[in-house]
């Protein structure tokens, strides 16, 4: 019994130490010295989850009516059964509408035949304007912690690594709270909560600014934002069952 108590205490201490190391300013951006998040098994993938009755369905497999290319033109990605598939090198896509505070749900499947490693293995992202939740194959594929799957890219590693193997459907359920500005100054940070495969991996985290690579940048005033799915020019990642709920 005593050994079980000691083991539980040690695990709790490790979790606290990891949480303290997650703050964006605790390490240089993209530092490989940050602790890796603990790995958890999220369980098997289930069937596509139905959208709530008050949701706006952004993609149900039937077409790209709610989407446009990165330049406002036609979507350059493919339709495959009930999913959309990235055409590597064709560019990002984005929603036609702009949104404020929202809950966004989507499912994605990574390429099981990807030849890459680290950041070059099924890399993509879900953007709320300038703020990114990373999409990556992080199943037995180490990389810098603030760039792995379900990281708030360049800022917060996930609380745990809840990745499934590539080739299996995975899900993100994300709550985005927009920053508040007064006279061009951010008086409230943007916040993100993320569930990866139904596991809490980001808990209402305050962002220190927009997403960037290798540098940190400050907030710039903006209004409602488009949801953007990234073409990182790596692999033919698939997305399906995308819906959004506006939060009042």
Task: Enumerate the predicted regions with their spans.
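Bacterial N-terminal signal peptides
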Residues: 1-9
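Carbohydrate-interacting regions of secretory-pathway proteins
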Residues: 13-248
């Amino acid at each position: 019994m005593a050994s079980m108590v000691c083991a539980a205490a040690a695990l709790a201490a490790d979790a606290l130490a990891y949480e303290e190391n997650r703050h964006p300013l605790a390490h240089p951006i993209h530092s490989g010295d940050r602790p890796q998040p603990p790995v958890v098994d999220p369980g098997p993938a289930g069937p596509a989850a139905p959208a709530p009755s008050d949701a706006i369905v952004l993609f149900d497999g039937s077409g790209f009516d709610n989407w446009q290319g990165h330049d406002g033109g036609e979507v350059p990605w493919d339709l495959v059964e009930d999913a959309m598939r990235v055409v590597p090198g064709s560019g990002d896509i984005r929603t036609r509408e702009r949104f404020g505070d929202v809950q966004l749900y989507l499912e994605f499947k990574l390429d099981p035949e990807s030849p890459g490693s680290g950041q070059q293995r099924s890399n993509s992202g879900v953007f709320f304007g300038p703020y990114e939740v990373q999409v990556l194959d992080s199943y037995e594929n180490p990389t810098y912690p603030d760039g792995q799957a379900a990281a708030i890219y360049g800022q917060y590693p996930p609380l745990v690594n809840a990745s499934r193997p590539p080739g299996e459907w995975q899900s993100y359920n994300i709550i985005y709270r927009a920053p508040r500005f007064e006279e061009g100054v951010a008086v409230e940070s943007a916040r993100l909560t993320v569930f990866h495969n139904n596991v809490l991996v980001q808990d209402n985290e305050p962002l220190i600014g927009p997403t960037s690579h290798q540098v940190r940048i400050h907030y710039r005033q903006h209004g409602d934002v488009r949801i953007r799915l990234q073409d990182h020019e790596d692999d033919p990642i698939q997305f399906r069952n995308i819906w959004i709920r506006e939060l009042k």
